Amino acid sequence: MTLEEQTFDLIRPPEWKGGVIFASPHSGRHYPAWFLAESRLDPLLLRSSEDAFMDRLIASAPDHGAALLTARVPRCVIDLNRGPEEIDPLVVSCAPPVALSPRIMAGLGVIPRVVSQGRAIYDGPMSQAEAERRIACFWRPYHRALAGLIDESVARFGGAILIDMHSMPRDALAHLPRPRPDLVLGDRNGTSASPRI
């Protein structure tokens, strides 16, 4: 199995319509043995960081003319929805200095320090070489595939519509009155999509 096959599944539709791409960067649940040996948590606790079964929810997208890119590598191994520079200095020893965003400070950088409820994944920091290996082996292939789909869509259709799928833990919506929404559409406060979409 190639690294790309370990990182993601890419399913193209029989007929691509309108440049729609569904992606699920946090649905990976194929835990490498080396990672399980390094983690201080049991596999069930590690799974709490997944957007569990999101890939199955959108599995029929290709049948409706959309491309589908889903993660196989778990979010707690590497977060495909972060920038490669978002390195937590508490996870990676001798990490290059970066601006500490709220996500990094919360332990949710490109290589997460914690899973849900702040449970630490590791007993101590990993080497810079290990962090670079994960980024090269998992993060870069996923983003090459995603960029390739977007570029192809722009060339064929004049644009691309990326629908990046995530689930939310119950406690993230606890502040909302009941009934809580079944679906939340986000556009990064109007910065990632045209209002027409």
What label would you give each PLM region?
Residues 1-162, 167-197:
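N-terminal catalytic or cofactor-binding beta/alpha core of small enzyme domains
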